[in-house]
A protein has these predicted regions:
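Membrane-integral, polyisoprenol-dependent glycosyltransferases
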Residues: 1-358, 426, 483-492
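Short periplasmic/luminal acceptor-recognition loop of GT-C membrane glycosyltransferases, typified by
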Residues: 381-491, 497
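A membrane-periplasm/extracellular boundary helix in multi-pass inner-membrane enzymes
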Residues: 234-238, 373, 388-389
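Hydrophobic alpha-helix feature that most strongly marks membrane-spanning transmembrane helices
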Residues: 330, 334, 346-349, 353, ...
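Hydrophobic alpha-helical targeting segments used for export or membrane insertion
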Residues: 1-12, 378, 382-390
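Extended hydrophobic-aromatic, low-complexity segments
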Residues: 339-342, 353-354, 363, 369-370, ...
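Signature aromatic-anchored transmembrane alpha helix within multi-pass, membrane-resident enzymes
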Residues: 305, 358-386
Length: 500
């Protein structure tokens, strides 16, 4: 209980003072709000338009958070913090279940304090839910294999007693249900633990293990759970969820670069193949400083024929390495590349590093180094989370315009924007305005403001005098300067408001 509470508090630090970052965070947050407004929890919408990029589990979690805390930046991010804390608890429980509680503590700390976890545990996106269910699937898949192997003559774990059918069924259900919920979090990549389990069986050449997976029944269970949402979603969207969600955002993303993230040519694709093997040293920081040591340690043990440390002859190292390799290979081959795509491998990597690092403390002073790195990272993380967000909030243009104009906003207002259409505009202003954002060009902006009823438009400040040279005295304007993170450029915006 103490561990889980501390993890949640660590991840939540600063989430209330940093505005949502364009573009993904406001899209998720607003789509969840529109689920509530539309009373439709099957098909997500953003700004009254279908949003078919991701399955619904992250939206459902945010909806639950909104019900508890209300709609805010904090409540949009709260589910990710919970998911990240649960991942650490799963790693801890996995290790403790295998008789190594101290390794579990180390692994949970390593995962929690890695840079990519620090970022995404505070982000209003779906990634941490994917990581959670993939980690659960990897753990339960491992338990299925290791416990099933007690019926064979080789690789029989010495730590375990007789297998109870109840336990075997529990791990079987956990494995296939985790695959289902992982899919509902972020799509087919959640099924990669199937590849890990399959590859482990092939490498072990123990074909009797495959029988205990009950693969056909398990896949049917997974598909049945997904179908409870998927069939209504396909019916409501006339198949668009499959065409866009899988066709565009899975298949096309794998074959071609999307949104400028990745290679623009085949030559660049080849050049970027080592992308994740380089970015891991940033994403997994500060623990990446020990990765070269871990590689040398694994190589020495393989050459010496030393069995896995701590767990007898259960080959956990091989299982963890297989899972890590599969995730890295999949995303290495995918054309679209972002540093956080390999985040599902981090729990496995944290457990692998903790097993060997903690084991080495018996003959070295590495334990002292671990404590120093952990304490320093935790203190720096808290300082950054609590100090930086309030200092940079003024550079978020949509957030600042909303704060300044909030007393003048009315629920029945219409609103539009010219040349600044970031999702944060929709998220912040729709918390006070019931209508949806209209995207207009310079010519239509004047016509829009000439319409009946209260309304406002957001335009670049350089266009204000051209578009509205002689505004009525009853009109109000608000100006802000900031930084468009999505496009990487500075902006100077003015909100022109007509109250009646």
């Amino acid at each position: 209980m103490f561990l889980s509470f501390g993890l949640v508090l660590f991840h939540l630090a600063g989430t209330w003072s940093l505005p949502l970052i364009d573009r993904d965070e406001p899209r998720f947050a607003e789509a969840s709000r529109e689920m509530i407004q539309r009373a439709d929890y099957v098909v997500p919408y953003f700004n009254n338009q279908l949003r078919l990029d991701k399955p619904p589990l992250a939206y459902w979690a945010q909806v639950a958070s909104y019900r508890i805390f209300g709609e805010s930046d904090f409540s949009a991010r709260f589910p990710s913090a919970i998911a990240a804390a649960l991942v650490a608890l799963v790693i801890f429980a996995w290790s403790r279940c295998n008789g190594a509680t101290s390794v579990g503590w180390w692994a949970a700390i390593i995962f929690t304090l890695s840079l990519q976890t620090f970022v995404h545990a505070k982000a209003a996106v779906a990634d941490m839910w994917l990581v959670l269910f993939m980690t659960l699937a990897h753990w339960s898949g491992y338990e299925l294999l290791s416990r099933s192997s007690r019926g064979t003559a080789r690789q029989m774990p010495v730590r375990l007693g007789p297998v109870k059918p109840y336990h075997q069924t529990r791990w079987w259900l956990t494995f296939y249900l985790s695959l289902a919920f992982g899919f509902l979090a972020k799509g087919p990549i959640a099924w990669s633990p199937l590849l890990t389990v399959g590859a482990t069986i092939i490498l072990a050449r123990d074909w009797q293990l495959a029988r205990h997976l009950k693969l056909l029944r398990g896949i049917l269970l997974t598909l049945a759970v997904v179908a409870l949402w998927g069939i209504p979603a396909l019916v409501q969207t006339h198949g668009l969820f499959l065409a866009i969600g899988i066709g565009r955002h899975v298949i096309s993303r794998s074959l071609v670069t999307m949104e400028g993230h990745g290679a623009s040519s085949f030559g660049m694709y080849l050049l970027l193949l080592p992308f994740y093997f380089v970015t891991i040293f940033v994403s997994f920081f500060p623990w990446s400083i020990k990765l070269p040591w871990l590689i040398r340690q694994l190589c020495r043990q393989k050459k010496a024929g030393i069995a896995d440390p701590g767990y007898g002859r259960n080959q956990l190292d091989n299982y963890l390495l297989t899972g890590i390799a599969i995730i890295f290979v999949i995303f290495t081959l995918v054309a679209t590349k972002l540093p956080h795509y390999t985040l599902p491998a981090f729990p496995l990597l944290a457990l692998l590093l903790a097993r060997h690092w903690q084991g080495a403390t018996a003959i070295t002073n590495h334990g002292s180094l671990f404590r120093k790195v952990a304490i320093t990272s935790a203190c720096l993380g808290l300082a950054i989370a609590l100090i930086i967000p309030p200092a940079v909030a003024r550079f978020f243009p949509a957030y600042q315009l909303f704060r300044e104009s909030r007393p003048n906003l009315q629920p029945n207002m219409q609103f539009a924007s010219v040349e600044f259409e970031e999702p944060s505009v929709v998220w912040y202003f729709r918390s006070r305005v019931q209508s949806f954002l209209n995207r207009v060009n310079k010519k239509n902006a004047v016509d829009f403001m000439s319409g009946p009823g209260p309304r406002f438009v957001i335009v670049p400040t350089s266009l204000v005098q051209t578009l509205f040279p002689n505004p009525p005295q009853t009109w109000t304007s608000f100006r802000t300067r900031g930084f468009n993170i999505a496009k990487g450029n500075q902006v100077d915006l003015t909100l022109v408001l007509k109250s009646e």
